[in-house]
């Protein structure tokens, strides 16, 4: 479990990439946020991290973050940050976090009386024991990591396309920009 924190009141950073629960719920798209708008401490994260929400283990919020190497990357303290010694086993850790046995273990060890108030202590998650040989973890990671990296690339592209749509659509709807009449639009395809 990562313990390096970011204090927005003491930071010289102006803008950070913020991995928050609302950002996760918005198609796992971290946001660039002005530090002066951040009210509480965050976790500093890097390429070796996997995030999962400590709230309500039944609601799976597991994130393999797309790190911005040009900015400081921070995660909400509502996430448990699992940091591996290197990013080669992140896909293994990510998939363990999705595993029903791990989720059941977390549910059995939460604090709080109702589903909306249940929390997982980071030490509980870190102390999860799994009897598996290092060679199996290595082989699994060699096979799965390329797919996980592709998933991160596609998620990043989705974010860019969503941003483009959100910029262009209001301008199209208001008439500020128009599609020229000489462009043929195919009704049965998603292309112009």
Name each region found by the language model:
Residues 2-6, 85, 191-192:
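Alpha-helix capping/hinge segments and adjacent helical runs
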Residues 20, 81-83, 129:
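Short, well-ordered beta-strand micro-motif
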Residues 87-88, 104, 111, 127-192:
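Amphipathic alpha-helical coiled-coil/heptad-repeat segments
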Residues 4-8, 55, 59, 100-101, ...:
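A generic secondary-structure signal for well-formed alpha-helical elements
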Residues 15, 20, 31-34, 70, ...:
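Glycine-rich, flexible loop/turn motifs
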Residues 1-50, 59, 64-66, 74:
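Sequence-specific dsDNA recognition surfaces
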Residues 43, 47, 51-103, 108-124:
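A short beta-sheet element
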Residues 20-25, 55-56, 134, 183:
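Short, small-residue-rich loop/turn micro-motifs
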């Amino acid at each position: 479990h990562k313990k390096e924190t970011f204090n927005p009141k003491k930071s010289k950073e102006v803008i950070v990439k913020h991995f928050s629960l609302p950002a996760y719920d918005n198609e796992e798209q971290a946001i660039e946020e002005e530090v002066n708008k951040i009210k509480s401490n965050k976790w500093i994260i890097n390429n070796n991290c996997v995030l999962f929400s400590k709230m309500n283990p039944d609601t799976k919020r597991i994130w393999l973050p797309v790190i911005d190497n040009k900015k400081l990357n921070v995660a909400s303290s509502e996430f448990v940050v699992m940091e591996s010694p290197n990013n080669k086993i992140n896909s293994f850790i990510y998939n363990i976090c999705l595993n029903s046995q791990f989720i059941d273990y977390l549910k059995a060890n939460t604090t709080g009386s109702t589903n909306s108030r249940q929390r997982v202590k980071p030490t509980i998650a870190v102390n999860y024991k799994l009897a598996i040989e290092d060679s199996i973890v290595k082989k699994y990671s060699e096979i799965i990591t390329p797919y996980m990296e592709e998933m991160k690339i596609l998620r990043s592209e989705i974010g860019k396309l969503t941003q483009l749509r959100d910029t262009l659509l209001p301008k199209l709807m208001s008439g500020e920009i128009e599609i020229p009449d000489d462009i043929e639009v195919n009704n049965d395809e998603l292309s112009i």
